[in-house]
Amino acid sequence: GADDTATHELALWQVHEIAAGSTLSLGKVAAGARSYLLIAGGIDCPQYLGSRATFTLGQFGGHAGRALRSGDTLPLADLAECHLPALTRLPEALIPQGAGAVNEAQGKNDQGKTTGREWQIGVLYGPHGAPDFFTEDDISTFFGHRWEVHYNSSRTGVRLIGPRPQWARADGGEAGLHPSNIHDNAYAFGTIDFTGDMPVILGPDGPSLGGFVCPATVVRAERWKLGQLAAGDRIRFVALTLEEARAIEVQQDAVIAALASGQLDTLEQRQAETSGATLSAIAAKRPRPDDSPVLKCLSAEQGGEQIVYRRAGDDFLLIEFGQMELDIALRFRAHAWMLWLKEHPLPGLMEMTPGIRSLQLHYDPRSLTLETLMAHLEQAEVALKDVEDIEIEARTVHLPLSWDDPACQQAIDKYQRSVRPDAPWCPSNLEFIRRINGLADEAAVRETVLNARYLVMGLGDVYLGAPVATPLDPRQRLVTTKYNPARTWTAENSVGIGGAYLCVYGMEGPGGYQFVGRTLQMWNRYRRTEHFTTPWLLRVFDQLRFHPVSHEALEQIRRDHPQGRYDLKIEKTRFRLADYQAQITEHQAETDAFRERRQAAFQQEIDDWHARGQFTFEDQINEVQEADSLSDDELGIETPVTGSLWKLEVAEGDDVEAGQVVALVESMKMEVEIRTHTAGRVVRLPIKEGSGVAPGQPLIVLSTAVEATDSADASAPDNARSTLSSEETL
């Protein structure tokens, strides 16, 4: 028969039956940031660590661990097991407008620049607040300000633009130079993490462990909004109580249950109860939190060490032990609590994640209330006052280290060129480490790192089994600050120091530790070998020793290690806390002298930063250049999104065709192609590469009065252009 080229527009929020051989085309997202396509039965892809979700940074899960590409084939699951929903179309009145934003329409600010949608997002205050980490004014500003979503956002985290905190502390002590730095603890889902002076809402692909303060956490019922925040949108955080957060979730659960069962009357009633007016009313009543994130505090006499319980959203509890200092005994106390909770299980307690001096508990508030959990923990307070006799099995793992590896130098160079040209740790992280620790030369830095025995205090800092470790001997603890702002790129398995801690990056991604070199893989995605009996290589309380190798030798080791062809030296040992404490006491005078010298150099660095105006950093990346006015015969090629002008594909004087790609804009970790819709000649390029851009802003100015020299050739018939058959698109 004849070709059927008919095109049918399909409504959203509706179940459709698609005929075999059809092609489904998806257009632009009109509201929010993401659109979702659900297929009956789902896509048949293998599970990885119990999930089919794609983790592109880790390169596993989903389809080949990456974003889809043209030509990929996706097998569908067995439709025999699929049950269609009772409702095949969502009633018009129940369809969220503007993806749930308070104000869905884009408008203009006082300067006439395009602004995005405005959102209200419900959060719980904590785990970190005033007066410990922030000032009271900081907290008022945080909840009173309308934060703007930065274009450099993704599933890892939503970066925000807004006022810089004044901070309650001068610095982070041994955790780092900046007052946002703390000793690493686990992060709750949806927590708002201040990486230096810049807040980031941690998303589903965000880190599980890190060393930055978090003043608020998005509650469970509000986390869906994180997936629809687009660059340029504005957010106001609404301070909820735990009871309000729970009530919103109960209502939301009822809406979903009514939707699944097709009970329209119940659904409309529940939808009305969960309208945005609820958050607006709460915000008007409570412009900032009127409670504390600290739920309970025990003295050292009551708990063996000071114990602080901090609220971290409506399904996490952060327990901190002792003072805010690096003390290995506190890590063992957290370990003892975790063992006790394993021996005394509590229904609804889903996960435990230890930090340097903390233990975070993830619980299901539907089945376990916070009050019940806190009552259960009172038994641990009594049972675990003394942990000095604890003894554990451990290993010494000998790792190769390519000192000042070219991959580290590349990351530093990229950071200096694209993020912060005047950073005090550039162009050499090693020189910065030397200077801030008062060492004679870089050789002394190398000697200290290679002679130290590093105790692994936690895994997953930041991802994929990455260890956070510290020298057992306090006289070998080098202290640095972390990058502010963080790097956008770090090579896999780079080794760095941040605060008093060493980290091996488990995968390529952002980072903030000061580089010393690079080592072998910490994670093996698919292959099991003698040393990779699990995907992760290391265990908590392993002791790491580094030995130097050349860059070329490391490259060969990195090829052999995942295949099981590298002879990694691992020795079994034991660690008894009481014996270690005795050794520390024996060398206390030397340790105190070392700390005094280090602190003097540390303070000198701070003073120098203040003198040079480098203690704080103001992000200029998002500043938008003003657009030139256009004459009658000129046409501006505009950007549809907020972002950064990544690359210009044309130069002044070039003739362009209709549909030609003329620029690339980076937004939300994606490259957006900017195409012309008409032919013309480029007469001006008003925006420089690397500049911030906003919707409606002309990136390229064309003259429509000038006839493009080859425009006739550009208008070739459709059948002369490249096409894909239906078989090729499957």
Regions found by a protein language model. Give the residues of each.
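Conserved "landmark" site that anchors the functional core of diverse proteins
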Residues: 1-624, 726-728
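Short hydrophobic beta/alpha edge segments that flank linear recognition/processing sites
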Residues: 24, 74-75, 232, 654-675, ...
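A broad structural signal for short, well-ordered beta-strand segments within beta-sheet-rich domains
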Residues: 183, 349, 645, 682-684
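Short histidine-centered loop motifs in beta-beta connectors
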Residues: 222, 227, 530-531, 646-655, ...
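Long, charge-rich, low-complexity alpha-helical segments
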Residues: 242, 363, 368, 658, ...
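Periplasmic scaffold and linker elements that assemble and bridge Gram-negative envelope complexes
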Residues: 610-637, 642, 667, 701-719, ...
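Acidic, low-complexity mobile loops and tails
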Residues: 620-661, 673, 679
